Amino acid sequence: MESENSSEQYDVLIVGAGHAGAQAAINLRQGKFEGTIGLFGDERAHPYERPPLSKEYLAGDKPFERILLRPEDFWGERGIDFQSGARVASVDPLAKTLRLANDREVAFGKLIWAAGGSPRMLPCPGAGAANIHAIRRKRDVDLIREQLDEAQRIVIVGGGYIGLEAAAVMRKMGKQVTVLEALDRVLARVAGPQLSRFYEGEHRAQGVDIRLESMVELFETDERGRAVAAVLTSGESLPMDMGLIGIGIVPEVGPLVSAGAAGGNGVDIDSQCRTSLPDVYAIGDCAAHGNPYADGAHIRLESVQNANDMARVAAMHILGKPMDYDAVPWFWSNQYDLKLQTVGLSTGFDDCVLRGDPAERSFSLAYLRDGQLIALDCVNKTKDYAQGRALITAKAHPDREQLADADLTLKEVALV
């Protein structure tokens, strides 16, 4: 629904009503910003949490009302003009205007771009079939749930967090699940080999057929336009009733890049979330930044933590209280009765230390680079996650032998 406020000019206009955009609006009001704020989302829904889409909402354990970021009347009560169904077609940074897909022109004093991304889909025949879905938005999951009664054989393409979380939900529903991963292990882009092997074993024990180094050549479709089989590059054909695609996102940055913003895989920002365009910020999944926990590499992070922390940095700059983005990254994933909590970034690690016994389904993996603790993957081990975060923030160099001793808390591990 469109807001009743017909204002076509805002002191701050926020494009994208996910975690990042919504939190930016909240932070501005919490910081006593008195100007006008527009919050434009392209979905026909109020701002909501994204992580439950592949977990509790997909499983039917949480209704939509319980994953709203705030009650629907929250925005209007705080003078935030929320508008749904608003998709941006172009931006004019000199005139400080943007044009929506319905040809409306909206002016802004400052622009916060928090548009996130769209699901990366397979570029193969049949990928657009009516029973092949991504898991990115509420409507994606609503369609999946509508079709589940007629779907027993589920093929999931992508062995990252989204794919594995969906696999766990589908197995709990009693579905026959196959996961296809192009690389030689699951979670290859986000975790070390030991964690990958652990999760492969857990899913296989639950009855999931995990196929590594497997890619889809095409989807065979029937006369109704529905995919009935996934044909692999090996020639093997897997009968299917539904396909789920979880192979990452394409950042929604076209209008900004076309307007002259620096970027490619996302919009480039500085440490205060400013793009190369004046008075234009970018935050969340679509923002490429030099991350101090990635050894200075220019990266994008797709997480609630990154969205919320960047939202705060952008809001503080607008409020005249600039700060640098230097938050330690963290992530989580729930699969079956396993709670994975990750803190830091393991990219470039040269040593990995196991704390605990994976057979007991409660352990941590500590990643080091040149002796410095840079990341932890904690499975059902919340204390390690909480205490390890402080060590990673401090760029600590723990004693390796003590680090491997799970009888010692991370607070008790000596530093060298």
What do these predicted ranges mean?
Residues 128-151, 223-226, 236-313:
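FAD-site-proximal beta/loop scaffold in flavoenzymes
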Residues 14, 18-19, 44, 117-119, ...:
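Residue-level detector of alpha-helix initiation sites
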Residues 34, 76-77, 82-100, 106, ...:
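A Rossmann-like FAD-binding core segment of flavoenzymes
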Residues 115-173:
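Glycine-rich dinucleotide-binding loop and its adjacent helix/turn
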Residues 9, 228, 236-265, 338-416:
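C-terminal catalytic lobe of FAD-dependent flavoproteins
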Residues 2-3, 7-11, 30, 286-383:
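Mid-to-C-terminal Rossmann-like scaffold of FAD/NAD(P)H-dependent oxidoreductases
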Residues 14-15, 106-116, 157, 238-248, ...:
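Short hydrophobic core segments
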Residues 2-81, 169-191, 387:
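Beta1-alpha1 glycine-rich phosphate/pyrophosphate-binding loop at the start
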